């Protein structure tokens, strides 16, 4: 194959190249190590010595010409690809906007945040603590003796003999009192764990517990705080009542009910005056300081607020249910 034939073939084929893949095939065929132009140069040794300079010059000129045409074609293809890419990215700003799908808060989270807002507006700080607790913080410091049913392994998730998943957020109150001097007013929201699962109980649920320590606090202060909370959470006509109960960390202790129109009296939380033994465990003088504490299940409040009858709906991840609140 002579130089003129290769030149003619290269020009004709290059004109037909329309994409990067075809361009690469052309490069290999004509400019590659085993390409046709390279083969022409290798043929130089077969020519008589007097013909070699002119032939070599002609082949080099052909290579330069084909390389130049190749570069021009490559640039054309790259520009074409860039135009196509830009065309795909073109935005018609005259078109109407498209609404983006967004999620929304889980009903339990919404109620948790509402509870926090209510108590923060009443002067309480929000404090959090670890979900894996020592038995001392979870039970002993809260005046809960070893024989108490709450400490049974059938009711609590133990990790070791001394560590467990907290059964309430009251340990946060202990940690706070160990770190701060009174007076204090805190709430401690978070996850808690108990071995229970039915229509009204979950093995993992959410609590908000509160503690207020100051001089000369009484049940009257506790009742006022809970009345204010009930009115803000359930409406200005909500009423509460306190029924005697027992908790190892408060004395006296109460179950607190709220009266809701259409439902009657419904239990919403437990509360009481802090037991002096709890103060002694954290280094507070019970002769100088008094305090009240309360705790509520957020799922329970959510069920009452939204009229939900089965607590398990909160964890079934049914979008139809969750999107209703």
UniProtKB/Swiss-Prot annotation:
It is found in: Cytoplasm. The keyword Magnesium applies. Gene3D superfamilies: Bira Bifunctional Protein, Domain 2 (3.30.930.10). Binds 2 magnesium ions per tetramer. PROSITE patterns: AA_TRNA_LIGASE_II. Keywords: Aminoacyl-tRNA synthetase, ATP-binding, Cytoplasm, Ligase, Magnesium, Metal-binding, Nucleotide-binding, Protein biosynthesis. It catalyses: tRNA(Phe) + L-phenylalanine + ATP = L-phenylalanyl-tRNA(Phe) + AMP + diphosphate + H(+). Its EC number is 6.1.1.20. Coiled coil: none annotated. GO terms for molecular function: ATP binding; magnesium ion binding; phenylalanine-tRNA ligase activity; tRNA binding. GO terms for cellular component: cytoplasm. InterPro entries: aa-tRNA-synth_II, aa-tRNA-synth_II/BPL/LPL, Phe-tRNA-synth_IIc_asu, Phe-tRNA_ligase_II_N, Phe_tRNA_ligase_alpha1_bac, Phenylalanyl-tRNA_Synthase, tRNA-bd_arm. CDD domains: PheRS_alpha_core. GO terms for biological process: phenylalanyl-tRNA aminoacylation. It comes from the Bacteria. Signal peptide: none annotated. Mg(2+) binds at residue 251. Its cofactor is Mg(2+). Belongs to the class-II aminoacyl-tRNA synthetase family. Phe-tRNA synthetase alpha subunit type 1 subfamily. Tetramer of two alpha and two beta subunits. This is Phenylalanine--tRNA ligase alpha subunit. It comes from Thermotoga neapolitana (strain ATCC 49049 / DSM 4359 / NBRC 107923 / NS-E). The lineage of its organism: Bacteria, Thermotogati, Thermotogota, Thermotogae, Thermotogales.
């Amino acid at each position: 194959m002579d130089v003129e034939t290769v030149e003619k073939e290269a020009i004709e084929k290059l004109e037909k190249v329309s994409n990067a893949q075809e361009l690469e095939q052309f490069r290999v065929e004509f400019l590659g190590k085993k390409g046709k132009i390279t083969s022409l140069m290798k043929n130089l040794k077969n020519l008589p010595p007097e013909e070699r300079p002119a032939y070599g010059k002609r082949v080099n000129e052909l290579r330069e010409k084909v390389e130049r045409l190749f570069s021009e074609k490559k640039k054309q293809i790259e520009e074409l690809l860039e135009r196509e890419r830009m065309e795909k990215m073109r935005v018609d700003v005259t078109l109407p906007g498209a609404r983006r799908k967004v999620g929304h808060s889980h009903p339990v989270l919404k109620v948790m945040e509402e509870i926090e807002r209510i108590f923060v507006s009443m002067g309480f700080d929000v404090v959090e603590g670890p979900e894996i607790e020592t038995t001392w913080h979870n039970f002993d410091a809260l005046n809960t003796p070893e024989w108490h049913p709450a400490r049974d392994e059938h009711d609590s998730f133990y990790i070791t003999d001394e560590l467990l998943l907290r059964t309430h957020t009251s340990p946060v109150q202990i940690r706070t009192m160990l770190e701060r001097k009174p007076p204090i007013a805190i709430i401690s929201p978070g996850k808690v764990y108990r071995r229970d699962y039915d229509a009204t109980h979950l093995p993992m649920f959410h609590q908000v517990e509160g503690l207020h320590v100051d001089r000369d606090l009484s049940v009257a202060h506790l009742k006022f705080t809970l009345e204010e909370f009930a009115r803000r959470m359930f409406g200005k006509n909500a009423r509460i009542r306190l029924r005697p109960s027992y908790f190892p960390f408060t004395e006296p202790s109460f179950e607190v009910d709220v009266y809701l129109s259409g439902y009657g009296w419904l239990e919403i939380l437990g509360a009481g005056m802090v037991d002096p033994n709890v103060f002694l465990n954290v280094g507070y003088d019970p002769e100088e300081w008094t305090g009240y504490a309360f705790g509520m299940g957020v799922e329970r409040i959510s069920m009452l607020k939204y009229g939900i009858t089965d607590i398990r709906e909160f964890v079934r991840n049914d979008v139809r249910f969750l999107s209703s609140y």
